[in-house]
Amino acid sequence: MKILLAIALMLSTVMWVSTQQPQRVHTYCGRHLARTLADLCWEAGVDKRSGAQFASYGSAWLMPYSEGRGKRGIVDECCLRPCSVDVLLSYC
């Protein structure tokens, strides 16, 4: 009985993995990068916030996190190398 359950679980896992499509990656540079990012952020309903909004809370510990993704930028991740839509959305 345990063997049948294990086989059924394994088959369902294999079928689930086979139905998952990997995200396509593209290279976005220049105006194409800017337009794609603007469209994605607009569709997601995300507005870029300034650091001044975090300062209004009076929490100094939030300021280091308001700087974004660090020294590597969107050009490093999406122009020099292909990136997915999820990576682009992380810059909204």
From Swiss-Prot:
Span of the secretion signal? 1-19
Gene3D superfamilies in alphabetical order: Insulin-like
Q: What is this protein identified as?
A: Bombyxin A-1
Q: Which residues form a coiled coil?
A: none
What organism, scientifically named, is this protein from? Bombyx mori
Its domain of life?
Eukaryota
Q: Where in the cell is it found?
A: Secreted
The disulfide bonds in this chain are 29-79, 41-92, 78-83
